[in-house]
UniProtKB/Swiss-Prot annotation:
Coiled coil: none annotated. This is Tegument protein UL23. One of its GO terms (cellular component) is viral tegument. Plays a role in the inhibition of host innate immune response by disrupting the interaction between NMI and STAT1. In turn, NMI-mediated transcription of interferon-gamma stimulated genes is inhibited. It is found in: Virion tegument; Host cytoplasm. It comes from Human cytomegalovirus (strain AD169). GO terms for biological process: symbiont-mediated suppression of host innate immune response; symbiont-mediated suppression of host JAK-STAT cascade via inhibition of STAT1 activity; symbiont-mediated suppression of host type I interferon-mediated signaling pathway. The keyword Zinc does not apply. Pfam families: US22. The keyword Secreted does not apply. Interacts with host NMI; this interaction inhibits NMI interaction with STAT1. Belongs to the herpesviridae US22 family.
């Protein structure tokens, strides 16, 4: 493992590798531990960047604890490489000055930087398991109702699913329990407030989290994102229904995603990888 680390750091002009090691070359593919269908392509990117230094500085500003970043390579599916690209821009891997690894991802509504590992060694051991928005079909629950929910491709399909399963209890992948609602339980003004707060053209209620401590409503917007709302706040829970089914409310407890746009940052509650309670500074 130490030889691999030396090669990795040599790629980033940190150290000179020992003579017995073979440094990774630009364009070389490094298979990921998870997910198995993707690899790291060293020093290759599929988006236009005019100034690499300024772009890395811009991405670092997304973090709650900014640090200098260095571009490592792109995360590509083997299918993407086989067909020589598609309309989706591959995610990019960055190395922080602290040794932490981050993943840049381009979403429909914003880009983001996600904390993926504390070190190069951890990244090589776990891959992208800390990226909650990355899901694989094998993680889907076996219940037909949740598989049908994950398969909804647009907001109208979701509304039909809700009508089919209204009133039922659903156990998500993190074992959180959701009660599916009907739209009649909500005032038009409440739904419109949600729509304005998340900046979407259309939102639909999903239900509420079964909890003895607070009333937490859940709704879906026309980008198929899932949000949680109480009397005071709205925050994003999942970037897709697939993520919501497999991860449930995980982002409320462990969230390493940092969005780039101001509107999404207001709707996101990240967990500092260094254990700093930034909420204390925000309230000061």
């Amino acid at each position: 493992m130490s030889v691999i680390k030396d090669c990795f750091l040599n790629l980033l002009d940190r150290w000179r590798p020992p003579k017995t090691s073979r440094p990774w070359k630009p364009g070389q593919r490094v298979a990921l531990v998870w997910p198995k269908d993707r690899c790291l392509v060293i020093r290759r990117r599929w988006r236009l960047v005019r100034d690499e230094g300024r772009d890395a500085q811009r991405l670092a500003s997304y973090l709650c604890c900014p640090e200098p970043l260095r571009f490592v390579g792109s995360i590509c599916t083997y299918n993407f490489l086989k067909h020589k690209g598609d309309h989706n821009v591959p995610s990019e891997l960055y190395l922080g000055a602290s040794g932490a690894m981050y993943l840049w991802t381009d979403h429909i509504y914003s880009d983001s930087l996600t904390f993926v590992a504390e070190s190069i060694t951890e990244f090589l051991n776990i891959g992208l398991r800390r990226c909650n928005f990355i899901t694989v079909p094998e993680e889907l629950p076996h219940t037909a109702s949740l598989r049908a929910l994950a398969g909804c491709m647009h907001i109208h399909a979701f509304a039909q699913w809700r009508a089919t399963y209204r009133g039922r209890l659903m156990v998500m992948g993190d074992y959180s329990v959701i009660r599916v609602s009907t739209i009649r339980l909500y005032d038009w003004s409440e739904i419109n407030d949600w729509r304005v707060m998340v900046g979407s053209n259309h939102v639909e209620p999903l239900g509420w989290l079964v909890s003895p401590y607070d009333v937490i409503n859940l709704f879906v917007d026309d980008c198929m994102r899932v949000f949680a709302a109480n009397n005071q706040h709205v925050c994003i829970v999942a970037d897709s229904l697939m993520e919501f089914v497999t991860r449930g409310m995980t982002r409320c407890h462990e969230n390493g995603i940092y969005y780039g746009t101001r509107s999404m940052r207001k709707l996101n509650k990240p967990t500092c990888p260094y254990g700093v309670d930034h909420q204390l500074f925000d309230d000061a």
